[in-house]
């Protein structure tokens, strides 16, 4: 974005000009960035009305019994630890509605590979929602078990698909990002161990 200096007013905040949305630290994958204010405003509007298509791939602890489902719980800052997010009552101060749909891609006994589709985009949404069901993400040192898998580069969460209407042309744009090597290697290892 350096070459766009002077064309971005910092709609999302002075320290993040052009950034339409964020992904969690240690999450890999696709991110929407605008190169000018008009694009930023149009893309931010799509984000606010939840019309941007976002699918994440994740590996969760445990065996999810159903082939698909959803988590619909309000999220906000954890009152005991303000650095974390938590499921809150819908009338709690700062609580925001959040919806995560999920579908099982593969099962490996003690782990399940899932696709998560977001209707909302709250901080740590997938991580907190899945942890609230008893299936935190593999490698998640914040919301997962204390003995999380240290060999992973953070949680197994990847922004795989991203789709939106181009702000100038009106054309639907869809992108797909391959899994990063550490994530793909972990899936390969789980497949081998599960077959053994």
Residue ranges and their predicted role:
Residues 1-196:
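RNA pseudouridine synthases
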